[in-house]
Amino acid sequence: MAHSVKIYATCIGCTQCVRACPTDVLEMVPWDGCKANQIASAPRTEDCVGCKRCESACPTDFLSVRVYLGNESTRSMGLAY
């Protein structure tokens, strides 16, 4: 199942999220909006497994990369008792 992956303009081009992704969903593309002149991009969201390792690896205060799980994934997680 594909999940929605959003990259925000707060990305500093550090490549931490790209290296953390186990399924190579993310890649860096040229961008003039930061010192690194690159920003994360998510061209292969159909391969996203929703592990959110990219979010954990992001060093910015406001996570620059976010994975939004679909309703199906949320429902299948169940309730904790």
Swiss-Prot record:
Sum up the protein's function in the record's words. Apoprotein for the two 4Fe-4S centers FA and FB of photosystem I (PSI); essential for photochemical activity. FB is the terminal electron acceptor of PSI, donating electrons to ferredoxin. The C-terminus interacts with PsaA/B/D and helps assemble the protein into the PSI complex. Required for binding of PsaD and PsaE to PSI. PSI is a plastocyanin-ferredoxin oxidoreductase, converting photonic excitation into a charge separation, which transfers an electron from the donor P700 chlorophyll pair to the spectroscopically characterized acceptors A0, A1, FX, FA and FB in turn.
Name of this chain's protein: Photosystem I iron-sulfur center
Q: How does it assemble?
A: The eukaryotic PSI reaction center is composed of at least 11 subunits.
Enzyme kind, highest EC tier: oxidoreductase
- NCBIfam families attached to this UniProt entry: PS_I_psaC (TIGR03048)
Q: Which SUPFAM superfamilies match?
A: 4Fe-4S ferredoxins
Location(s), subcellular: Plastid, Chloroplast thylakoid membrane
The record lists the organism as Mesostigma viride (Green alga)
Q: Which GO terms describe its biological process?
A: photosynthetic electron transport in photosystem I
- Give its E.C. classification number: 1.97.1.12
